């Protein structure tokens, strides 16, 4: 089992594609959070051991070690190291898990971990020519999905886009369009309810952005992606992305910009400083599944993580499954024997509502779950994400009282 504690966390608002945060570099987005947490946590910066951030793209401004760039941009000491991890959509959660493992092994007492992604600023990329005077050039938009796919893997596993994998899961598990749209509408409604209750005020750090050519700025304080008007009737009018498919722009997560970071440490450092943690990290798990059915990865990861934590699913008070696509979450729930109307499932809405900046989402889920447990006064939460190329990652946390 793991033995690490979540003491604090922040995230930026999640911006829509080409929206308010599109003018901000990903290392600067993460740096804002690192600086604020270092300043306000109550712990000494000298106690920090490392900064670990997840990032999925790493093809542009987020290349050459996002974490190190972000901590330097934040003004943290140069003696503090930083490393960047990539497990695609679960990169942010994997960063938190790596920090928790290090703390549990006694390799440092305090870590900053999370992730960032600016999908708006993802560059176009192309390979160098393999031969002289080549006339073959292929340009990829690195925002999402595969580029430079290995032909041997394509032959073996196919090269389905992420939405196509959502449709694959829908067909395999009998998820129809109405089911998917109902889940999407529920995600929007749950997000709006949490917003109106002020839940997100405790986790969002507003971001100042450029607003004009004359040096004007404005403060971005709220997520841009949610669509409160997206009821079942509105969702039903949207076309499927692929003929005969279930996935639409309305029942899928967005293309977004954002960052999320949590502060983790051992129990003793909190006791020394008189700071009470939000939650204890108990266990984690990562699994592999067929790439064309990548969306079902959370189900196996959740069960394995719960087994390692020594608890049953019915003991869990809050279940966060990242909403890459509605059919994918519904299939996981079906395999787990759960109903999407179960109040434990994504009670504050999910990525269909607030968006999915790939490298940040895992850390966002950890932060939301830790705060959510405090709100509902339940003991355990489980957090999970599906991962492109066929993986699932999960973490189990326990509320600190």
Task: Walk through the language-model features, giving the residues of each.
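Active-site-proximal alpha-helical scaffold in enzymes
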Residues: 86-117, 170-199, 261-268, 333-334, ...
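Conserved catalytic cysteine-centered active-site region
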Residues: 24, 55-111, 143-145, 156-161, ...
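Active-site pocket-lining segment
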Residues: 167, 203, 213, 282-353
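Flexible glycine-/small-residue-enriched beta->alpha junction loops
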Residues: 110-168
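N-terminal extracellular/periplasmic Venus flytrap/periplasmic-binding protein-like
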Residues: 11-12, 23-27, 31-32, 40, ...
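Conserved active-site "lid/cap" helical segment
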Residues: 1-74, 78-81, 165-177, 187, ...
């Amino acid at each position: 089992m793991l033995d690490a504690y979540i003491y604090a966390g922040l995230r930026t608002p999640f911006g829509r594609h080409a929206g308010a945060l599109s003018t901000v570099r990903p290392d600067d987005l993460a740096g804002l959070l690192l600086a604020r947490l270092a300043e306000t946590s109550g712990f000494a910066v000298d106690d920090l051991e490392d900064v670990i951030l997840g990032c999925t793209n790493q093809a542009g401004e987020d290349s050459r070690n996002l974490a190190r760039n972000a901590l330097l941009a934040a003004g943290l000491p140069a003696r503090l190291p930083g490393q960047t991890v990539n497990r695609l959509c679960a990169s942010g959660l994997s960063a938190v898990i790596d920090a928790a493992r290090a703390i549990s092994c006694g390799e440092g007492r305090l870590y900053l971990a999370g992730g960032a992604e600016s999908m708006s600023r993802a560059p176009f990329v192309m390979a160098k020519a393999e031969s002289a005077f080549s006339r073959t050039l292929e340009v990829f938009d690195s925002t999402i999905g595969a580029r430079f796919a290995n032909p041997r893997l394509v032959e073996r596993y196919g090269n389905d886009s992420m939405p196509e994998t959502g449709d694959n899961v829908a067909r395999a598990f009998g998820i129809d369009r109405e089911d998917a749209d109902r889940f999407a509408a529920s995600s929007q409604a749950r997000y709006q309810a949490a917003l109106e209750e002020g839940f997100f005020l405790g986790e969002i750090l507003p971001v100042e952005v450029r607003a004009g050519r004359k040096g004007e700025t404005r403060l971005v304080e709220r997520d841009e992606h949610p669509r409160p008007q997206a009821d079942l009737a509105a969702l039903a009018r949207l076309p499927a992305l692929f003929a005969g498919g279930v996935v639409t722009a309305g029942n899928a997560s967005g293309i977004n910009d954002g960052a999320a970071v949590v502060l983790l440490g051992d129990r003793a450092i909190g006791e020394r400083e008189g700071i009470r943690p939000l939650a204890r990290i108990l266990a984690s798990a990562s699994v592999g599944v067929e790439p064309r059915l990548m969306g079902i990865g959370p189900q196996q990861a959740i069960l394995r993580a719960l087994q390692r934590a020594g608890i049953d699913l019915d003991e869990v008070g809050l279940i966060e499954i990242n909403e890459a696509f509605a059919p994918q979450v519904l299939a996981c729930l079906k395999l787990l024997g759960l109903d999407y109307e179960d109040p434990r499932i994504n009670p504050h809405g999910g990525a269909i509502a607030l968006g999915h900046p790939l490298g940040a989402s895992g850390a966002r889920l950890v932060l939301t779950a830790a705060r959510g447990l405090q709100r509902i006064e339940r003991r355990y939460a489980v957090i999970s994400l599906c991962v492109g190329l066929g993986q699932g990652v999960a973490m189990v946390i326990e509320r600190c009282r």
